[in-house]
Amino acid sequence: MKRLLFLLGILLLTIEGFAQRVILVEKGDVVSLLDAFREAARLNNDRDSERLFILIPNGYYDLGELTLTRVAGNNIAIIGESMEGTIIRNAPDKSIEGISRTAVLQNRGKGNYYQDLTLKNDLDYYASEPDGRAVCLQDKGFRTICNRVRMLSYQDTYYSDNEKCQHYFKDSEIHGTIDFICGAGDVWFERCKIVTEKRSRDGSGNNIIAAPRTSKTKWGYIFNRCTIVNDVSDYYYGRSWHTNPACVWLYTTLLTPEKLLPARYDPKGMKTSSNYFKEYGTMDAKGRNITPKTNVVTFTLRDDTKPFVAETIMTREELSKYKTKNIFTSWNPVKQLKKLEKQSRKLQKKHFKN
């Protein structure tokens, strides 16, 4: 009966003249949430499906040990009531830790949009040392947008798991310890907050933010006007995973610049030493430019082989290429985000009671 009422709710929201197709999740009901994902996958199976909105009220949606919950449809907008109040959480057993096994959500669709929610992976990271890979969003999709999405975990928090992917983040927050923004494709992070956590239970060890493995795209990870919050240990911007990793930090605000290690990027690569690692216009909390004039690093593999020497400070000429229209030549995520945010705001006002 509950399933029948759930489906009837979808039809009523469509029939009563709303411009958008909407599924409204029952407040705090994780079964209703899972039903919504399944129904959205059925309704929006076609890659050109009309936009479908899933509205999730503030609440704690506990998946328990369930992992890899799929968002398999296309052109789905998953809209919470607020970033801090709408929390989707899982807690995998530490025995299954792994980058492809633990995700809270696994996005598999094209054109999906996430807004105003938190994904939390509660795997017992410190009990899993030296490993503890616990993903919040494993994104195997294409052209995903995350707007005001918070991800709480430690290692491998966000995983762009599609070699040709294009994704866009804005005003989001990602927490972690090591390689906690990792994977392939071209991903633009606009005005996001990057927060490091303790690397180990006793606080020892350095943090590493990004681990790109750029292979079939050109640009890799672009962090633009982001803020790094680090109150715990020293850290690097990132390190090489494999193939031709690319990562740039543009106009970054460092709240604790003294904790950024001198090389700025980890000189030890995992499977490759070559890379395109750059920064430009780095600032302290008062907005003062603290970018070194030069920073030449000798990158090697972990065994000190295959040295690759590179300057990591970007020139103005290089900077001029970093525009969203150059990265995403046939997609305008900025325009799409504005449109979806406006539509979502109207739906939130209509369906969420303050």
Predicted features by range, described:
Residues L4-L13:
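Sec-dependent N-terminal signal peptides
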Residues Q20-N354:
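Sequence-level preference for short, compositionally simple segments enriched
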Residues I15-A19:
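Sec/Tat signal peptide C-region and signal peptidase I cleavage site
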